[in-house]
From Swiss-Prot:
The keyword Membrane applies. GO terms for cellular component: membrane. The chain crosses the membrane at residues 18-38, 47-67, 68-88. Its main location: membrane. Predominantly expressed in flower buds and stem. This is HVA22-like protein a. One of its GO terms (biological process) is response to cold. It is a multi-pass membrane protein. It is found in: Membrane. Belongs to the DP1 family.
């Protein structure tokens, strides 16, 4: 009976990375992410969002260089240690890697890259930039100034609508501008 338990313990220790890897890299972060969504704190949201960004980058690198990585016998242990460092909030590993390595590349690419992409051509801009700009304008100029801009835009829209309607009356209903 003692040898059976010893053999079982040996198998567990030899395959520790295989057993602990998914728990550390997926199960616990998924649970913690759901808990973070349910709280009002933004600090834990940032922790888990940065973790998932780094997890996806690590997975992408691992899939890209799979043939090279299989030559490293300790890769699974290195990945487990790295993942533990990223996951455990006490170490703030995910925040550190994101702030020092990922953020400079994606948030301010012009400081890293030598090529130039104009702001209008940047396809990676956030869709809520308009909302952010509106909030900033309201904070600086007040809600009354914002209402004036909206009323001017509404008047302009109505004017343009009448312009299109005149084309419709001239050319028929099938006319498209």
């Amino acid at each position: 009976m003692g040898s059976g338990a010893g053999n079982f313990l040996k198998v567990l220790l030899r395959n520790f990375d295989v057993l602990a890897g998914p728990v550390v890299s997926l199960v616990y972060p998924l649970y913690a992410s759901v808990q973070a969504i349910e709280t009002q704190s933004h600090a834990d949201d940032k922790q888990w969002l940065t973790y998932w960004v780094l997890y996806s980058l690590l997975t992408l690198i691992e899939l890209t260089f799979a043939k090279l990585i299989e030559w490293l016998p300790i890769w699974s242990y290195m990945k487990l240690i790295l993942t533990c460092w990223l996951v455990i909030p006490y170490f703030s590993g995910a925040a550190y890697v994101y702030e020092h390595f990922v953020r400079p590349v994606f948030v301010n690419p012009r400081s890293i890259n030598i090529w130039y992409v104009p702001k209008k051509m940047d396809i990676f801009r956030k869709p809520d930039d308009v909302l952010t700009a509106a909030e900033k304008y309201i904070a600086e100029n007040g809600p009354d100034a914002f209402e004036k801009i909206l009323s001017r835009a509404d008047k302009s829209k109505r004017y343009n609508k009448h312009e299109y309607e005149s084309y419709e009356t001239m050319y028929g209903e099938g006319y498209q501008y």
